[in-house]
Amino acid sequence: MKVRIGFGLGTRNQLHDGSLITVVEAMEDLGYDSLWVSERVSSGCPDPIVAMSVAAARTTRMKIGMSVMVLPGRNPVLLAKQLATLDRISDGRLLPAFGLGAVDEGEQQAFGVERTTRGALFDETLEVVRKCWADADVHHEGTHFTLRNVRVEPKPVQRFPEVWLGGGSPSELRRVARLGEGWLPSFVTPEQAATGWAELSALAATHGRSIDPEHFGVVIPYALQPLPNATVEALRQRAKGAVDDVVPQSVEHAESLIRRFIDVGASKFVLLPLADPGTADAWVEEMSALATRLLPLQT
């Protein structure tokens, strides 16, 4: 089992200027395995395609992923070309991870998607993206998209980029079982993750599929400063339990939690700050503090 630790920027960051370059370069220099960018139109966080392009140009080793990119509402052909280009520029370092998008009226309006149809649109969009990556001439007759002899170039360096999906609800696990190559849940305890992995493996088998055990990951939200009471209460409702079980609030606690996840079979981790560290220097300081204690866990 190869333990790898990446770092996510989240949706609260304001790294939409040259500070992004400083943070990305420091992340690779510190030894993190991967960078993960998030998406929120109404937030100051940078656009994921642009942020990943910056990272691809300023790094040589670190993998580049999304945690997560909203899929429903995007043109699948253009998205396939954008991501294939990114995979080529980065020499095969792309880690695609997609989601349905925030349950927020403004965000859904921004993507032009109704909540009641976004699940079906997600499935078909991903199907078309994969066809564009793999097929010389793309044919597709679906509910939302029709393509006849459409050629999409370039193709990605990775023959079939492996798609990571998150979530832990029954419907989300069913989607991962049908469509995903990797599972990346968040706000879960090690015990919940282990139960979810067992359920996912059984569901995948019903579709004649299996998920590689090396693709069992977890997003670990953390807070190195005290959280406001309102945030703690919101986290408690989301986590369905004690916040301390899913949100480490010290470097030592983060190490202990990762070790517990490793014990139940997880091996890919994304550290995600719940509070924006602020300046580029503050980001680097926080990443450095975590790296000293956590990156030795990588194998």
Model-predicted segments: where are they?
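Conserved, mostly hydrophobic/aromatic
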Residues: 27, 31, 55, 86, ...
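Short, acidic/polar
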Residues: 15-27, 78-82, 165-178, 249-260
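Active-site mouth loops of central-metabolism enzymes
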Residues: 5-18, 69-77, 157-168, 238-252
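Flexible, glycine-rich active-site loops centered on histidine and acidic residues
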Residues: 2-15, 73-139, 186-187, 191-192
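Glycine-enriched alpha-helix->loop->beta-strand junction motifs that scaffold or abut catalytic
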Residues: 31, 58-61, 90, 112, ...
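Hydrophobic faces of well-ordered beta-strands that scaffold small-molecule active sites
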Residues: 5-9, 35-37, 63-67, 94-98, ...
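An alpha-helical appendage that flanks or caps ligand/catalytic pockets
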Residues: 111, 115-156, 186-289, 293-299
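N-terminal beta1-alpha1-beta2 module of alpha/beta enzyme domains
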Residues: 1-59, 160-161, 272-281, 285, ...
